[in-house]
Regions:
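N-terminal signal peptide c-region/cleavage motif recognized by signal peptidases
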Residues: 16-18
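Acidic, small-residue rich beta-repeat scaffolds with periodic aromatic anchors
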Residues: 21-46, 54-59, 125-183
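Long, charged/polar, surface-exposed segments that mediate recognition or autoinhibition
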Residues: 96-135
Length: 183
């Protein structure tokens, strides 16, 4: 009887710990351009690099390339729409890249926040390879402004168009390293 109780207690602890993964964010990299075009090169880690071409004008666009020193593989995201804010005759475009780690399995991701729903992405990194893990443009009828919120236990994707707000909960499939959005 005691053995059964100990086994049940151990199983309960094991199941509880596998469900209690936390999302941990790193310091975001914020890139901005004012009425024009700019190229940025930044280190994500000592081995990972991000190259960005960001344009602000009548519309904003961004091209991103994730690379590593050790691998020839690269992930390119091209012509991502970026929200342009116009104030005092200036067109400003801003792009935010936020590192994200799942503490249960150590998987690393990068949130790409362009402010425009069609440009929002999550990029995964595992074993020297970058992969697109979430593309908001794949969601049905997604337009307008957008943002991510990272909470301890979940990632939320918010959209706002014509005064209508929508929130999606993003669930990670650890086998495919992709996120599924549920409204």
């Amino acid at each position: 009887m005691r053995k059964i109780l100990l086994t049940a207690a151990f199983a309960a602890l094991t199941l509880a710990s596998s469900v209690s993964a936390n999302w941990i964010t790193g310091e975001p990299t914020i890139l901005a351009v004012n009425s024009g075009e700019a190229a940025f090169h930044t280190a994500l880690t000592s081995d990972q690099r991000l190259d960005v071409n960001l344009t602000a004008g009548a519309e904003g666009k961004a091209d991103l390339t994730f690379t590593t020193k050790a691998s020839e593989s690269a992930l390119s995201l091209t012509a991502l729409p970026v929200l342009v804010n116009e104030e005092a005759g200036y067109a400003d475009a801003k792009l935010t890249i936020t590192p994200l780690v799942n503490d249960a399995n150590g998987l690393r991701f990068y949130l790409v926040d362009t402010g425009e729903a069609g440009g929002a992405h999550i990029v995964s990194y595992k074993g020297g390879t970058f992969k697109s893990a979430f593309n908001a443009a794949d969601l049905e009828n997604i337009n307008g402004a957008s943002s991510f919120t990272v909470e301890k236990k979940q990632i939320l994707f918010h959209t706002k168009e014509n005064g209508t707000d929508a929130t999606y909960t993003l669930s990670l499939d650890t086998k495919s390293l992709t996120f599924t959005a549920v409204k």
